[in-house]
Amino acid sequence: MVALVLAALALVAPPKPHIVWKPIPFGPTRLAQMKAYSERHYGIDSYVLHPRAIVEHVTATSSFSSAYNTFSADVPDAELHELPGTCAHFIIDTDGTIYQLVRLDVMCRHTVGLNWAAIGIEHVGLSDAQVLGDAAQMRSSLELTIRLMWRYKIPLADVIGHNESLSSPLHKELDAAWRCQTHADWKRADMNVYRARLVVLARRYGMDVGPPPKLRPTGCG
């Protein structure tokens, strides 16, 4: 059904935006940590990512370097105290520069419950509104996201904000203590604005990306 909805051979393939490859250290040790994390939290004995969703984030920092350095350091995160360290596949700076930090076939720790299935895109900024109002950053974000949707046949329903993670049908978490963990960035109202802009861009390339995600009960308070 998803394949039919996407019909995703677009009339015109969305162009690949300019991406600066700036990898964080992700050698054998971190890969092994990611594999162990995946086994603990998803029951998947692998660090290999097969993208089925895209999660949008806000860095809560005012500079690219601050976010990059946080992701580069493979240390236990301050919130959940696990390895590997947190990371995202992309960071989009306020001037619209897209940096890729991690290969798209490798899982990254950016969203509890969805790291097994989702590409993570971070936007340098302090709020959803700031990112939505930054023309250069928003243009790059939409161009990157629509290209990834086309490449991996990801429907609009699986392009979500971090704050929407618990309602994703792809969400799964084996650790009960983590099952309801999420963050405040990219609330549904802001993501509805973002997704509406994506739909406009998708039409330009003849892409039928399907409907937006439905609200689902999360079982969390």
Where are these regions (language model features)?
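Short coil-to-beta-strand
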Residues: I54, V112-H123
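N-terminal catalytic cores of peptidoglycan-degrading enzymes
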Residues: L9-T111
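General N-terminal targeting signals
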Residues: F71-V75, M107-R109, N115-A118, S140, ...
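Basic/polar, cationic surfaces and motifs that engage anionic cell-wall
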Residues: P14-R30, V48, S127-G221
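Short strand-loop junctions, especially beta-strand C-caps/beta-turns
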Residues: T59, V124-L126
